């Protein structure tokens, strides 16, 4: 057996093309394996690219949905704040009207009454300032064309001097809150005469 082992150890192929063919076959098999692996990686890359595009699309839709949600929530919050303010201010306006009427009718006769009148004037200006800070503005009605969205016609009279319905007197002041009608003005309206 020792002799067989020696012969196997010393065995060298006689034909050099045999070694070259074996190397070529190994290289071809190795190249085929590389090509198969490249094809596999390309397929995985393609799948990952599709998944990435899908996730990017979902992300974009999600961000748009969130932005719409944020805008809707802000709009609802603003509407609620407006509603609460409008309700409170509608309750306060009659008090303000009465204060204004009392202020207008007060005719001080002596120094003491004059001081009291001046105090009322200061409170009135402060009250008016608070309303303005809250976004309340008085409507200008007299001389304006009648607008049923802003005016409530209490009285009507025919007049030759007008070509369209026009507000000629204001019986109760109207107010706006953030450019929306808080309370319509109660007005007297002049309408064109029937023959004109």
Curated annotation (Swiss-Prot):
Keywords annotated in UniProt: Chaperone, Cytoplasm, Stress response
Keyword Cytoplasm in record: yes
Subunit description: Homodimer.
Keyword Nucleus: no
Its job: Participates actively in the response to hyperosmotic and heat shock by preventing the aggregation of stress-denatured proteins, in association with DnaK and GrpE. It is the nucleotide exchange factor for DnaK and may function as a thermosensor. Unfolded proteins bind initially to DnaJ; upon interaction with the DnaJ-bound protein, DnaK hydrolyzes its bound ATP, resulting in the formation of a stable complex. GrpE releases ADP from DnaK; ATP binding to DnaK triggers the release of the substrate protein, thus completing the reaction cycle.
GO molecular function: adenyl-nucleotide exchange factor activity; protein homodimerization activity; protein-folding chaperone binding; unfolded protein binding
HAMAP family xref list: GrpE
A biological-process GO annotation: protein folding
Taxonomic source organism: Gloeobacter violaceus (strain ATCC 29082 / PCC 7421)
GO cellular component terms, A-Z: cytoplasm
Family in the record: Belongs to the GrpE family.
Location in or out of the cell: Cytoplasm
Stretch list, region Disordered: 1-24
Pfam families to which the protein is assigned, alphabetical: GrpE
Gene behind the chain: grpE
Protein name per Swiss-Prot or TrEMBL: Protein GrpE
PROSITE patterns noted in UniProt: GRPE (PS01071)
């Amino acid at each position: 057996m020792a002799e067989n082992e020696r012969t196997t150890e010393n065995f060298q192929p006689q034909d050099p093309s045999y070694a070259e063919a074996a190397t070529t076959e190994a290289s071809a098999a190795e190249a085929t394996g590389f090509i198969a692996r490249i094809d596999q990686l390309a397929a995985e890359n393609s799948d990952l690219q599709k998944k990435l595009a899908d996730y990017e699309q979902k992300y974009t839709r999600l961000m748009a949905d969130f932005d719409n949600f944020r805008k809707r929530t802000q709009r609802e919050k603003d509407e609620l704040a407006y509603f609460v303010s409008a309700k409170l201010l509608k309750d306060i306006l009659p008090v303000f009207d009465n204060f204004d009427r009392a202020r207008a009718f007060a005719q001080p006769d002596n120094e003491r009454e004059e001081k009291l009148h001046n105090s009322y004037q200061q409170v009135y200006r402060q009250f008016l300032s608070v309303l303005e800070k809250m976004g309340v503005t008085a409507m200008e009605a007299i001389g304006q064309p009648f607008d049923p969205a802003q005016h409530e016609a209490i009285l009507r009279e025919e007049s030759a001097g007008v070509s369209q319905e026009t507000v000629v007197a204001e019986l109760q002041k109207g107010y706006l809150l953030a450019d929306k009608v808080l309370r319509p003005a109660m007005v007297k309206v002049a309408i064109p005469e029937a023959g004109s």
